[in-house]
């Protein structure tokens, strides 16, 4: 304890200006480059994730393709992080593009050339100066082979995909360094990228892509003459034929009602000729609900709402009513040259059914 007191006392006895100067010189940390927890080396173009962990840009790129999560805390990496990374030192990227020597190494991208990172450039220059025919490079967790004779690079386990490389002066126009664009303009960044670990510009072209129109799933209706009509706009020929059929039905309704057998109390009900025939409805949304309400209005003639229901009604009438009181057997021609048989069945209070075909 005495030693600690003496240390504190000696520090307090120092002059004020000297303490300030020494504190500045001793405590001011030098700008050290952080180490990457993925490659276990000094970070090259360090970037900071949203979780504040720092890695090499290419190391993050390789890790994001494998798991899309931080290598330390497993927090999810945003989808657009590779296109809009958070660089700790943007000035370092510009300095790397200027280079330290006269020559630099480049790999081919879309509409331009990319400069290799500082570490990879040193490896390539060292192999080239020693006269090697090829050398291996570890980029974003993938092993690449640089063929220095044919000046191409490819993955060691995928020889089919090759990319040109070259050794050129440092001042040539370039797109960026190691997949990082020198012009970090949001308008020039395309979010659709392929899996290219070397940071090449492998953006898929989307300008020619067009939006395909949605195909309607509604099946069109078929008119009487076989032509396709829209569900919302029924065929005018079909509507006209139905109206003519019901008009003919109204004229022959009196004779049909008189010839049919009448039960007790039916004299008080109106005949179909004195009632008003409802207008036909060709809406596809309607169902057979009107057929169940015939007993409530015995004088009303039930109008069927589609040609399919009319044909089903004719087949049912042939099975349930063998003896019909009247059958006109006349078919009306429609616009397409075909014929249609319209049948309407009415129910009377005594349970008998009267079927009239037009």
Curated annotation (Swiss-Prot):
It holds the Pfam family zf-C3HC4_3. SMART domains: RING (SM00184), WWE (SM00678). Its EC number is 2.3.2.27. Residues 91-167 form the WWE domain. GO terms for molecular function: poly-ADP-D-ribose binding; ubiquitin protein ligase activity; ubiquitin-protein transferase activity; zinc ion binding. Keywords: Cytoplasm, Isopeptide bond, Metal-binding, Nucleus, Phosphoprotein, Transferase, Ubl conjugation, Ubl conjugation pathway, Wnt signaling pathway, Zinc, Zinc-finger. Residues 283-297 have a biased composition (Acidic residues). One of its GO terms (biological process) is protein K48-linked ubiquitination. A zinc finger (RING-type) spans 36-74. Can form homooligomers. Interacts with PARsylated AXIN1, AXIN2, BLZF1, CASC3, H1-2, IPO7, LIG3, NCL, PARP1, XRCC1, XRCC5 and XRCC6. Interacts with DDB1, DHX15, IQGAP1, LRPPRC, PARP2, PRKDC, RUVBL2, TNKS1 and TNKS2. Binding often leads to interactor ubiquitination, in the presence of the appropriate E1 and E2 enzymes, and proteasomal degradation. This is E3 ubiquitin-protein ligase RNF146.
